[in-house]
UniProtKB/Swiss-Prot annotation:
Record-listed N-acetylserine modification sites: S2
Protein's UniProt name: ATP-dependent RNA helicase SUB2
Complex formation: Component of the TREX complex composed of at least SUB2, TEX1, YRA1 and the four THO complex components: HPR1, MFT1, THO2 and THP1. Interacts with HPR1, YRA1, and YRA2. SUB2 may mediate the interaction between the THO complex and YRA1. Associates with growing mRNP complexes during transcription. This association requires the presence of HPR1. Also interacts with SAC3. Interacts with THO1 in the presence of RNA; this interaction facilitates RNA binding of SUB2.
Domain Helicase C-terminal: residue ranges: 280-441
InterPro entries listed in its UniProt record: DEAD/DEAH_box_helicase_dom, Helicase_ATP-bd, Helicase_C-like, P-loop_NTPase, RNA_helicase_DEAD_Q_motif
The keyword tRNA processing belongs to this UniProt entry's keyword annotation: no
Domain Helicase ATP-binding stretches: 93-268
Other facts noted in the record for this chain: Present with 51700 molecules/cell in log phase SD medium.
Key word rRNA-binding present: no
Naturally occurring in which organism (per UniProt): Saccharomyces cerevisiae (strain ATCC 204508 / S288c)
Regions of compositional bias (Low complexity) in chain numbering: 23-41
Chain positions covered by the region annotation Disordered: 23-52
Family according to the record: Belongs to the DEAD box helicase family. DECD subfamily.
Amino acid sequence: MSHEGEEDLLEYSDNEQEIQIDASKAAEAGETGAATSATEGDNNNNTAAGDKKGSYVGIHSTGFKDFLLKPELSRAIIDCGFEHPSEVQQHTIPQSIHGTDVLCQAKSGLGKTAVFVLSTLQQLDPVPGEVAVVVICNARELAYQIRNEYLRFSKYMPDVKTAVFYGGTPISKDAELLKNKDTAPHIVVATPGRLKALVREKYIDLSHVKNFVIDECDKVLEELDMRRDVQEIFRATPRDKQVMMFSATLSQEIRPICRRFLQNPLEIFVDDEAKLTLHGLQQYYIKLEEREKNRKLAQLLDDLEFNQVIIFVKSTTRANELTKLLNASNFPAITVHGHMKQEERIARYKAFKDFEKRICVSTDVFGRGIDIERINLAINYDLTNEADQYLHRVGRAGRFGTKGLAISFVSSKEDEEVLAKIQERFDVKIAEFPEEGIDPSTYLNN
């Protein structure tokens, strides 16, 4: 249970239970489980963490039924066709459902979202007009997606209300929803800026919060302004509550900052940061001149087999221009970036998720946490500047342990340096894309 989120808080690094999960086992789990955010993976009772400090887990589960969840949750899980928890879920849920603080770092696609969704719903005893669960994330689309996960798993819990709040929309609408006891949510998913504004204006009462979750916590807490927003929100909640933090990447520098919000946390890390690359994802690069990118992209879209593709560029201007070019070249595409109006962003995100378009051009607004199951091709039209961001980008393809393909354009000396850093950081060999192409069976699921 956690207390304050102040800068000068003690770090509880001497007390946490730390579980190091073998990355290869986690990947195998992801491959054998159902293709969804709640169920990657088969169980492995012989955890690699057995000899590590505080690595005991009270319950070893072979299926979701062994978590002894509420019947309503179990029904929803069965409806989704889920049977076996992923390695991360297996090690985390038995303690998180009992209120243990959690700091979890595991690669994209291993079902971290389901950990806090199921854990908080399991503990929730809804009281009309009282917010019991707060989930904070850095992106509006991610907030929308998390809200949908709550709706999916609470389908047999009709008394549970969930709402999502983010900037770019009239705060008066949020205030109206919160004021009415018939519509006031028990679960709030929000971006930090909007939730801070609701707290400051006293539109929302967080004095009954029992669970406080930060998704993509490294991104939320590494930016000072966002961290201050989170601290202000944190101080508006009770001292006695559960705090859970999740991310695909957690640097050594950000972990002490996370721990300031936690007390006696269970810590879940993959055993080796170098193994964070995605199992089942084929990764290649293509060396070319900047002026050759458009022609090569068109060739790839013609030659490759894919369900949906996401193309990453470095600016909103380039996103708009490339989308125009693709549409003019008979490649129906949609673009999503941070400079468009919020309603438009959400509408386009939904359109892409609903398979109305197969091609999406985006900036890094789609680079973290967004789960669209049909994406099996990611193209870095402009290579990112950071190795960790590369992981988040290409993680949009090959989600949940399924196969996928990632191709990066390398057009400058800077790109070559970044590519070298990526390979060193993740201990992976990214090969040059063969001139003759590749066998679709290597990146397409049966």
